[in-house]
A protein has these predicted regions:
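Catalytic Zn2+-binding segment of zinc metalloproteases
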Residues: 170-179
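Hydrophobic helix-coil surface modules that form long, contiguous segments used
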Residues: 1-6, 11-167
Length: 179
């Protein structure tokens, strides 16, 4: 969501300066993976609960549910996930390590630079079909257009641009999301 769009999804005071913790429960097809701002706990087939968040602006509340293919890792105690639709699985698996390496390097640099550890728990990066923005810095669950998963040989500039977008969205965790 963007600023002032959360009101289209749920009842809220949709102002960036008003923050609240969120606890979300999702009912989705049992075969789907549910991702969001908090760590997901499967309660029963098709029922997922997302951990209560730190106080967030309303437009950061994020739920990404679908038959995702996922590559998971961990860096410095932070669970990481890279997710895309199943039809992109071979491309995601081929490119995931480069994105994990960029993500890890950014965490190391931002922790050093800002002196504040990443405060939002898990860090998922979800490549969403038909996403109308380049990317969105949702705490714990950053969304990107799925065109950033390359379907063929990528130029060095394309890889750089994706890496730059990953770094940019992560910087928002400290500048925008945390404050």
């Amino acid at each position: 969501l963007e600023v002032a769009d959360a009101r289209r999804v749920y009842a809220c005071f949709d102002q960036p300066d008003l923050k609240a913790p969120y606890t979300v429960s999702v009912t989705a097809p049992a075969a789907w993976t549910v991702l969001g701002n908090g760590a997901a706990t499967l309660l029963a087939p098709g029922r997922t609960s997302l951990a209560t968040t730190r106080p967030l602006a309303s437009y950061f509340v994020t739920i990404c549910a679908g038959p995702w293919v996922s590559v998971r890792a961990e860096h410095d105690g932070i669970p990481l996930g890279i997710h895309a639709r199943r039809s992109l699985e071979p491309h995601l698996r081929e490119q995931a390590q480069q994105m994990i390496d960029v993500t890890a390097a950014c965490f190391d640099e931002y922790h050093r630079l800002f002196g504040i550890r990443y405060p939002f728990g898990e860090y998922h990066q979800v490549f969403v079909p038909e996403f109308n923005a380049g990317a969105m810095e949702n705490p714990g669950c950053v969304t990107f257009r799925d065109q950033m998963i390359f379907r063929g040989a990528a130029t060095p500039d394309q890889v750089f641009q994706r890496s730059n977008t990953i770094a940019h969205e992560m910087a928002h965790m400290w500048f925008g999301d945390l404050v």
